[in-house]
A protein has these predicted regions:
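N-terminal glycine-rich anion-binding loops that anchor highly charged ligand groups
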Residues: 4-16, 35-51
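Short, well-ordered coil/turn segments that N-cap beta-strands
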Residues: 4-7, 42-44, 77-82, 113-116, ...
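Active-site beta->alpha loop and helix N-cap motifs at the rims of alpha/beta catalytic domains
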Residues: 45, 50-183, 203-206
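N-terminal amphipathic alpha-helix/helix-capping segment at the start of soluble metabolic enzymes
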Residues: 1-22, 69, 73-74
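Catalytic cores of alpha/beta
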Residues: 161-165, 179, 183, 233-248
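Conserved, mostly hydrophobic/aromatic
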Residues: 9, 17, 38, 119, ...
Length: 249
């Protein structure tokens, strides 16, 4: 059966790929060698900045993160949107920053070629991403709200636990349900995010779970939905294919 829609692919090799495999140590010279191939590939987007990149570029490589972004932008020449990953209120650092810092930082990032800012909070606290979504929209880039995926701890409920429940003991209940993730995604949409990503940074979502969750996200959201995962347990590719089958953009 022919596909009636075009799948948009975002490549993460130059940010999350090198961050996950060798601690974000790609030099500018190494990156420059592959940029012509990226321009020819014509991905919808490339995640090339943010996360640990700015810190590592300065701390370990003695290079400028702004030069990194601008050089990639000039080489790609609009063939793909350039993406960065922001920790919301924490930006690319490890402490919360005031709105004045967020405003200036995002403005400079867009001026140096950034097209999409993927924004997340590790606890899915929308209060920590609200300003970032608003400020990215205000400077003309695409705000991408990333909902962090995780799973509930495994609890073994014994017979005695059930007996104690009759006398008031509370049994553990699931927290990270499909409805939880849909609610967080809708929260991003309400804040003004132009797209939403289900971000599975630990590679925990299996194919059967994505087959359940992705249709609910697509049915609930008006904005495009992206899916990001890792292959830590070995089924990242299968989960990605299942996301495609169930309508991921």
């Amino acid at each position: 059966m022919a596909m009636s829609r075009k799948l948009k692919i975002r490549d993460l090799t130059l940010r999350d790929g090198q961050q996950s495999l060798f601690a974000t140590r790609l030099t500018q010279e190494q990156i420059n060698r592959v940029l012509p191939y990226y321009k020819d590939a014509g991905f919808f987007a490339m995640e090339v900045w943010g996360g640990a990149v700015p810190d590592s570029v300065m701390r370990y490589l003695n290079e400028s993160p702004w030069t990194r972004l601008k050089t990639i932008s000039e080489a790609i020449g609009g063939a793909s949107y350039l993406t960065a990953l922001s920790r919301g209120r924490n930006l690319f650092g490890y402490a919360p920053y005031p709105d004045t810092v967020l405003d200036g930082f995002y403005r400079e990032a867009v001026a140096n070629g950034l097209g999409i800012m993927r924004i997340f909070d590790a606890l899915n606290d929308l209060n920590n991403v609200k300003s970032s979504v608003e400020k990215i929209n205000a400077v003309g880039a695409i705000s991408d709200g990333a909902v962090c995926y995780t799973v509930d701890p495994h609890y073994t409920i014994t017979f005695m636990d059930r007996v104690k429940a009759l006398f008031g003991k509370k049994l553990p209940k699931p927290i990270f349900t499909d409805e939880y993730f849909v609610e967080k995604a809708l929260g991003f949409e309400k804040l003004g995010a132009k797209m939403v990503t289900l971000k599975d940074m630990a590679g925990l979502v299996n194919p059967s779970r994505i087959a359940s969750l992705m249709p609910k996200l697509k049915q609930s959201l008006k904005v495009p939905v992206d899916f990001h995962t890792h292959c830590t347990p070995g089924y990242g590719l299968a989960s990605s294919l299942m996301a495609v089958i169930h309508g991921v953009d």
